[in-house]
């Protein structure tokens, strides 16, 4: 069976849409219901707009109606986007505000602004984290790649902790480890004076962190290896330091400024995560 079920203005179909069911070859086994924008212009976009879009508490754009079970999952976060259609637990959804799951299976984006592009068994549980996995050993997130972007501002020789949201470090904004995990991290830090400035500060580190049960167990395994250290001009005293945060259970990236200047700092923490 194939054919047009409705066109704009007829059979209850909104103007500007063509809805067609295709069940002939090659769609005999899995039929396709096509919704096509029909505009008077040469090309036409198709927008799916949740109620409240453009506000802080806008609705989510989702592939299924939540049912609080593993079938369709829990309610999604405000302004979230979730195209994942298969899971084995109700929590495997984009439940964080502004979180995104592009597809795949058994993924969870629970942190605010967190992203899982696809794949299988990835968990992005902290602020702005990107996670990717191709499967897991026993539970989602126990074999994955993660990336978190941190930032902060120093004025003069002050010190500041770089965090994902630019505020004080917490249990969700400082490249936090999951319980029972080891993170092998590559940390790249850069800073400059905003505007047309020649000031350049770059540091690159590698380090291994372990967290058992509870934030207080977070620790460095071995030392921190400094791979790159660039400061231009040479008389800058700006520097970055890496340590374990046993209060919030994460990776602490601390920036120290240089006299007489304001520096904007950015940092990527890339982590190979296993548990």
Where are these regions (language model features)?
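Periodic small-residue-enriched repeat registers in elongated scaffold domains
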Residues: 57-173
């Amino acid at each position: 069976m194939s054919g047009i079920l409705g066109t704009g203005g007829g059979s209850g179909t909104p103007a500007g849409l063509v809805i067609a069911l295709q069940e002939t070859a090659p769609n005999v086994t899995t039929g396709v219901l096509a919704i096509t924008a029909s505009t008077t212009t040469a090309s036409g976009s198709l927008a799916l707009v949740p109620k409240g879009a453009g506000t802080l508490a806008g609705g989510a754009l989702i592939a299924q109606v939540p049912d609080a079970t593993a079938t369709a999952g829990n309610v999604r976060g405000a302004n979230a986007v979730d195209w994942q259609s298969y899971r084995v637990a109700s929590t495997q959804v984009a439940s964080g505000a502004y979180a995104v799951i592009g597809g795949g299976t058994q993924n969870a984006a629970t942190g605010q602004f967190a992203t899982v592009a696809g794949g299988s068994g990835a968990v992005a549980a902290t602020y702005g984290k990107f996670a990717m996995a191709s499967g897991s050993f026993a539970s989602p997130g126990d074999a994955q790649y993660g990336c978190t972007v941190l930032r902060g501002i120093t004025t003069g020789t002050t010190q500041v902790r770089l965090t994902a949201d630019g505020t004080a470090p917490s249990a969700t904004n400082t490249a936090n480890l999951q319980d029972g995990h080891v993170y092998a991290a590559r940390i790249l830090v850069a800073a400059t004076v905003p505007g047309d400035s020649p000031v350049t500060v770059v540091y690159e580190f590698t380090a291994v962190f372990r967290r058992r049960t509870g934030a207080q167990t977070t620790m460095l395994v071995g030392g921190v290896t400094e791979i790159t250290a660039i400061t231009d001009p040479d008389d800058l005293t700006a520097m970055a330091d890496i340590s374990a945060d046993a209060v919030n259970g994460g990776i602490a990236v601390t920036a120290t400024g240089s006299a007489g200047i304001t520096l904007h700092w950015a940092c990527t923490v890339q982590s190979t995560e296993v548990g």
